[in-house]
Amino acid sequence: MKPLNLVLGLCILVGCFLSCECHRGPRRHDPRGPFPPPPPPHGPGIGRPHPPPFGPGIGRPPPPPFGPGIGRPPPPPPCPPVPPHPRPPSNPSPPPTPSIPPTGPPTTVQATTMPAASISITTPTARDSTDIFWRLWELINSLLQQE
């Protein structure tokens, strides 16, 4: 899986950091000149338009809930006391060493290619990461072919 992750990661990095300039070509002088300034945001005046005045039938908006005549909000409830964390001992004992069972010699396979020659081939019992990757790849391919 590591080579596949590497390839996908590099593709993502190239896509993120590759500027579009190489697809457009080098920048050239624009013969149209600079763009005109944008129009004012709210018509021909300075700033925003004034809010509508309060007419005879419309009252003022209500005051904020905690204004000068109303009391302050209640304080939050106090937090319960937190017990102190226990201190580790000053001289901790070393962790126990795990017992490793003795390993036997690698398995020996006898090859009988010629009757006169006796050749022994030793193979390690540990799996190679490429072998695991290859089996995973075959599994993915077989699942995709079934669909």
Swiss-Prot record:
Residues 43-78 are annotated as: 3 X 12 AA tandem repeats of G-P-G-I-G-R-P-[HP]-P-P-P-[PF]. Residues 27-128 are annotated as: Disordered. It comes from the Eukaryota. Residues 1-22 form the signal peptide. Secreted into saliva by submaxillary gland. Belongs to the PROL1/PROL3 family. PANTHER family: SMR1-RELATED, SUBMAXILLARY GLAND ANDROGEN-REGULATED PROTEIN 3B. May play a role in protection or detoxification. This is Submaxillary gland androgen-regulated protein 3A. The gene is Smr3a.
